[in-house]
Amino acid sequence: MATLRRMSAALLAFDTSTEALSVALCWPQGHLAWNGEGGAQASAALVPRVRAQMAQAGLRWADLDAIAFGRGPGAFTGLRTACAVAQGLAQGAGLPVLPVDSLLIVAEDARARSAPDGAPCDVGVAMDARMGELYAARYRWDGARWAVVCAPTLCAPEALPPLWWPDGAVPAVLAGTGLALLPATGLACALPRQTQTDDRAAALLRLAQAAWADGGAVEAAQALPVYLRDKVALTTAERAVQATHRTPATSAAVGG
């Protein structure tokens, strides 16, 4: 299994782009990674879980160097929740933000499970986007860092072959909830090894550490979600999420 870096920075990271809720922390003396139920629960559960993790680690907001969040693509409500909370907490504590590609979180978790020795590999990611579509991407791990081969996109399952292997080279590993949609297309029998991923928190934290080391931090106002799919109107629940996580309210959590 891949290991976290020992670094002087203290980072808080969380992701609510899927049905799971992931929260992680690292600081010079250690790290914590937690995965639990998200989805409709995420908007109410995220801030309490963050505060619980901070308390368990014995950290204050002033001890943090940056806040990372899964920027998407993914579920609308989940992306709004994570982005609003990240911005609110960061502004309240005067911290920068590290936006992390949510599909790359899946790729990093799959890589750690299929190539724990850090060997180079390509990973194709497909996440169920509902409505018969997928959020898909392809990434390349060179043994030290990630590169984007095919950027995240919204597509039909039938469109995956040219996306995943435009050069004829099949990615060595596939991962994501969208793989369940592939048998209906007749593609499943031709696909390479598929990997289940379930430790998003640790994968997110490793990516946050890499982003921090590479100077990927931005001001809170510049940290935006990546949706890929347009949406005309918000549901009542989504409007409630936005109201709950507006900056002043969320910033108050920093002082709690």
Q: Model-flagged regions — what are they?
A:
Residues 2-73, 256:
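N-terminal beta-alpha supersecondary unit
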Residues 37-45, 76, 80, 84, ...:
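Residues at secondary-structure transition points
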Residues 55-62, 90-100, 118:
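Phosphate-handling active-site elements
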Residues 74, 89, 174, 205, ...:
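A residue-level signal for conserved active-site and pocket-lining positions in enzyme catalytic cores
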